């Protein structure tokens, strides 16, 4: 393994990296950073969770001259969540060098951003629409930009941002360095590389390095109407510290988070229809641990990097295998272990096989727990906690009452009563979940997407009137007259911008109504006993 000290970074950046607890570079970091420090253009192919933010962030920050009061680098990201997350990460890494980082995105008052831009940030992290808006307002000038980063370029293609990206790249000096990161390399991304990059170094993390060995992956065959009871039993048995539950649509997220609360679980949901303030509030509570279960759509969860997520539950199977990889990448981060569960209805076995082909890994089958198993699982967890308390805590103040209880009752009865008090009893509160149609495999596994984004994600073809593809439902965020690309750059029919102060997304259709493809048949899977999770 390569250490960060071997990569030629400045002392201030090494100080930040070491204070964050990192010593060894990941493969994408070890291969990217030396070339980037030499000023070379980079094409990096890597999935989420491989450390690519630091791979481009460290050389980007290393290049900044903090004595200059101008924007020297821009990072373009597909979603506001990812822009915020990248901005936070760059701030941590650049803290000791005193680099000023400014995220700009839809959903935030643009006048507030204009005031912040007047304070001369060194690096801008933002979504394409909002960056271009500031360029055209003359509130963001890029004449001194030396480095441009395109993060998750294929996602920006799928969301319809290619024209915006080209417009931004045209506005920066020709001598700039470009660092482009993308999980896949469809033709439109290759054309951008050919047009705006000079002899780029192509760095690709091998598939075996992105299959997330720290994550235990299980699938459960379960009927649609039984999913919720299976989920609650798993939550009771596994008692996750922090869990993310993925639903395919906004309706599903709303109904599922409400149902979990009715059954006594601290849960909240996020999706594209929430205001930015509400979404940030929910995420803050989740990070702080005041809610234990976050229910999310694929779109809303893009770019989330929340430490301590122990479990990911795929309540609805994702529309494509790449989304599955992004989903489970929310756990098992920074060397920690994680558990991912995938609920598969009888008609979705073909999609399960597509996912396994993409990840190059067979999932273990887990039997859906019964009610009795859920109760026993809870009790065993409680017993472990009691044993840990006996071994590690001072119980002197509690023994007198304990002795009095044992004079009147036998020890087994006392322990049984304690277990009963601490065990969550079965809850029969009625809940209502609208059934979602199954995702039926279209055959042939995952396909590379072309220039129009292709594919279906979150169950919506999402095409505008002129026939251009919105791609994966992660949303071009356009309605029929072309509005709402990233929740802030709204266009009316004549092309003028409607500058919404709230910048909020008006109905992300990509998280909308499910629309399955045609079946290519069902595959039979070998039955295995359920491992302990």
Swiss-Prot record:
A cellular component term (GO) from this record?
A: bacterial nucleoid
Which of this chain's residues are annotated to bind ATP? 46-53
Q: Which domain of life is it from?
A: Bacteria
SUPFAM superfamilies assigned to the protein according to its UniProt record, in alphabetical order? P-loop containing nucleoside triphosphate hydrolases
Recorded catalytic reaction(s): these are:
ATP + H2O = ADP + phosphate + H(+)
Region Disordered: list its residue ranges: 428-533
Q: Which Gene3D superfamilies match?
A: P-loop containing nucleotide triphosphate hydrolases
- What happens without the gene? Longer lag phase and slight reduction in growth rate between 20 and 45 degrees Celsius, no growth at 10 degrees Celsius. At 15 degrees Celsius the unusually long cells form large aggregates and are curved at the pole, with incompletely divided, thickened internal membranes. Decreased growth in the presence of H(2)O(2), diamide and at acidic and basic pH.
Q: Which parts of the sequence belong to the Helicase ATP-binding domain?
A: 33-203
Biased composition annotated in UniProt, kind: Basic residues: 524-533
Q: Does the keyword ATP-binding apply?
A: yes
Per the entry, what this protein does is: DEAD-box RNA helicase possibly involved in RNA degradation. May work in conjunction with the cold shock proteins to ensure proper initiation of transcription at low and optimal temperatures. Unwinds dsRNA in both 5'- and 3'-directions and shows RNA-dependent ATPase activity. Probably has a somewhat redundant function with cshB, as cshA can partially complement the growth effects of a cshB deletion. Plays a role in adaptation to cold, oxididant and pH stress.
Per the similarity annotation, which family is this? Answer: Belongs to the DEAD box helicase family. CshA subfamily.
Protein name as catalogued: DEAD-box ATP-dependent RNA helicase CshA
């Amino acid at each position: 393994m390569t250490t960060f000290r071997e990569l030629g970074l400045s002392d201030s950046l090494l100080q930040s990296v070491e204070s964050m607890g990192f010593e060894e570079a990941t493969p994408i970091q070890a291969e990217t950073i030396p070339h980037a420090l030499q000023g070379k253009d980079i094409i990096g192919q890597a999935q989420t969770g491989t450390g690519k933010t630091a791979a481009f962030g460290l050389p980007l920050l290393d290049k900044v001259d903090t004595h200059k009061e101008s924007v020297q680098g821009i990072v373009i990201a597909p979603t506001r969540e990812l822009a915020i997350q990248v901005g936070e990460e760059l701030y941590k890494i650049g803290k000791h060098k005193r680099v000023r980082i400014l995220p700009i995105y839809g959903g935030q008052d643009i006048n507030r951003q204009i005031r912040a831009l007047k304070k001369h940030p060194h690096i801008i992290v933002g979504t394409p629409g909002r960056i271009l808006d500031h360029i055209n307002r003359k509130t963001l000038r890029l004449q001194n930009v030396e480095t441009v980063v395109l993060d998750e370029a294929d996602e920006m293609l799928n969301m319809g941002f290619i024209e915006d990206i080209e417009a931004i790249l045209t506005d920066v000096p020709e001598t700039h360095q470009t660092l482009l990161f993308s999980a896949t390399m469809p033709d439109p991304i290759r054309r951008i590389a050919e047009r705006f990059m000079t002899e780029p170094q192509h760095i690709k993390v091998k598939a075996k390095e992105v299959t997330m060995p720290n994550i235990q992956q299980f699938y459960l065959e379960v009927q649609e109407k039984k999913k919720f009871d299976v989920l609650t039993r798993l939550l009771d048995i596994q008692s996750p510290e922090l869990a993310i539950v993925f639903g395919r649509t906004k309706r599903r997220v709303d109904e599922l988070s409400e149902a979990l609360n009715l059954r006594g679980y601290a849960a909240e949901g996020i999706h594209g229809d929430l205001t930015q303030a509400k979404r940030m509030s929910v995420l803050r509570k989740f990070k702080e641990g005041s809610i234990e279960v976050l229910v999310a759509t694929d779109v809303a969860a893009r770019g989330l990097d929340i430490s301590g997520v122990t479990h990911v539950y795929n309540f609805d199977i994702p529309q494509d295998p790449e989304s599955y990889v992004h989903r489970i990448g929310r756990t098992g981060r920074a060397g920690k272990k994680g558990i991912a569960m995938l609920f598969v209805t009888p008609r979705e076995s073909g999609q399960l096989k597509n996912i396994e082909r993409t990840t190059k890994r067979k999932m273990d089958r887990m039997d859906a727990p019964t009610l009795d198993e859920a109760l026993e699982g809870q009790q065993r967890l409680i017993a472990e906690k009691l044993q840990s308390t006996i071994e590690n805590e001072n119980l002197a103040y509690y023994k007198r009452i304990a002795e009095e209880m044992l004079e009147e009752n036998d020890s087994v009865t006392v322990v049984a009563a304690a277990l009963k008090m601490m065990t969550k009893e079965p809850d029969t509160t009625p809940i209502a979940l609208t059934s979602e149609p199954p995702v039926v495999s279209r055959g042939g596994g995952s396909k590379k997407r072309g220039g129009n984004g292709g594919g279906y994600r979150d169950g919506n073809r999402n095409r505008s009137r002129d026939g251009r593809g919105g791609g994966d439902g992660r949303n071009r965020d356009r309605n029929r007259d072309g509005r709402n690309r990233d929740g802030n750059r709204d266009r009316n029919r004549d092309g003028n911008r409607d500058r919404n102060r709230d910048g909020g997304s008006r109905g992300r259709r990509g998280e909308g109504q499910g629309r399955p493809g045609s079946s290519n048949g069902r595959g039979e899977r070998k039955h295995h006993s359920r491992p302990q999770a």
